[in-house]
């Protein structure tokens, strides 16, 4: 299955899931625009459509839909365009504002990046919408971290940060995200012990 097909299949899955959970038609329209915007750079920048970052916009949205039951199109749209791992894949804020509006752009701008010195403080003091986007976006990166080629240093830092920052924030935010982070932290700790 080629990149366009994999991207289109993910877009269809996002729309189908959103529709089945009751996201209104206008929300699905905004979400579809956001997903397409999040995929644009990936389609050109990533040579391999099986790269762990390729389907990230849709996977982050699906975490919010399936695990949180989030139906807020602004939160879902923000999750589709936030990128905390690869600056080359980030959608510029001006473009987000132009395509998706001020509210989505403001939410994206409020999501702290994992390398921020004040990450824990920023997440703890953020409103729930910011925390939901940050937790879902990061969880997807963490879930696919084992696919990062020979990057043991990233894995160690990611596990430490997930355990000490993201997991406690998940506890304050949503029970299902807490379960997901707890499971990931346990599983990844075992992987690190073996490597």
PLM region spans:
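Active-site helical microenvironments for divalent-metal-assisted chemistry
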Residues: 1-195
């Amino acid at each position: 299955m080629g990149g366009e097909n994999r991207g289109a299949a993910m877009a269809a899955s996002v729309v189908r899931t959103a529709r089945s959970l009751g996201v209104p038609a206008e929300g699905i329209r905004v979400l579809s625009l956001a997903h397409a915007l999040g995929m644009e750079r990936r389609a050109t920048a990533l040579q391999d459509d099986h790269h762990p970052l390729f389907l990230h916009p849709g996977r982050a949205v699906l975490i919010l839909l399936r695990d949180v039951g989030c139906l807020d199109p602004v939160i879902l749209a923000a999750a589709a365009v936030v990128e905390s791992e690869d600056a080359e894949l980030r959608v510029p804020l001006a473009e987000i504002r132009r395509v998706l509006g001020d509210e989505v752009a403001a939410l994206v701008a409020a999501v702290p990046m994992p390398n921020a010195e004040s990450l824990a403080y920023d997440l703890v003091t953020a409103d729930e919408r910011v925390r939901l986007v940050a937790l879902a976006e990061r969880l997807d990166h963490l879930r696919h971290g084992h696919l990062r080629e020979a990057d043991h240093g990233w894995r160690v830092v990611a596990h430490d940060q997930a355990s000490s920052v993201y997991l406690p924030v998940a506890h304050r935010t949503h029970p299902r995200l807490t379960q997901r982070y707890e499971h990931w932290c346990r599983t990844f700790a075992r992987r690190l012990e073996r490597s």
